[in-house]
A protein has these predicted regions:
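Short, charged, surface-exposed secondary-structure boundary motifs
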Residues: 1-2, 141
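Residues in well-ordered beta-strands of folded domains
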Residues: 12, 19, 63-65
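ATP-dependent carboxylate-amine ligase
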Residues: 7, 23-24, 33-205
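Acidic-glycine-rich active-site phosphate/pyrophosphate-binding loop
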Residues: 2-17
Length: 205
């Protein structure tokens, strides 16, 4: 790994320098595995590296967009404490002097013990956290949110029950020195409220 920043990575693979339009060191490990497999299959090195250089992140996995004002939004599926920590660790390595704002939630009718851990991790690796809903299902979303904020040691967070509003308001108020992470849904294009699947897409918002 030669360079690692918000525009991607410059890496040396088999004595060839290539630029990757993806972020996150764990993505590099996946790419190296692909390259090793291509060598086993005896695929031409230059052809393999050319294909690898064009790889895009999977939808909703450290998928990012740079706005017209220079701020950066990242959407990721991370919905467990471990996954959230991995994503935020990757972002912190390339943040520079940017601040990190994270939008998080936790699913309803699922393991309640992870909720305060989500709050703890988000607080530890972010400058500010917005706690919102994420597939509340048959639970009251505010009960889920209250479980999450039990993991906070400070009041460096806010609550916005409406996920769409949380994202819109955050986008309106960030500048070119801010990275906004929207975690939890990634590729999903719905919110599960009760037994209903309501259209919702973090990336499109």
């Amino acid at each position: 790994l030669i360079e690692n920043n918000l525009d991607g990575m410059l890496v040396d693979i088999d004595n060839e320098k290539i630029s990757l339009g993806i972020i996150g060191e764990f993505n590099l490990y996946n790419i190296l595995s692909v390259y090793v497999f291509s060598k086993i299959l005896k695929i031409n090195k230059i052809k393999s590296l050319s294909i690898i250089s064009k790889i895009k992140p999977p939808r909703g996995r450290l998928e990012y967009i740079k706005s017209s004002n220079g701020s950066i939004g990242i959407v990721d599926y991370a919905h467990t404490p471990n996954a959230l920590e991995n994503v935020l660790t990757s972002i912190n390595k390339i943040r520079g002097d940017n601040k990190i704002i994270s939008i998080i939630g936790a699913g309803g009718d699922r393991d309640k013990s992870k909720r305060p851990e989500m709050g703890r991790v988000a607080e530890e690796y972010s400058d500010y956290v917005i706690v919102t809903s994420d597939n509340p299902r048959n639970e009251n979303e505010i009960d889920i949110i209250n479980d999450i904020i039990k993991g906070f040691k400070t009041e460096n967070y806010m609550i916005e029950r409406d996920r769409k509003k949380a994202i819109i308001n955050a986008c309106k108020n960030i500048d070119n020195k801010t990275i906004l992470l929207v975690a939890g849904k990634g590729h999903e294009d719905y919110q599960i409220i009760g037994n209903n699947y309501i259209p919702h897409n973090d990336m499109e918002i």
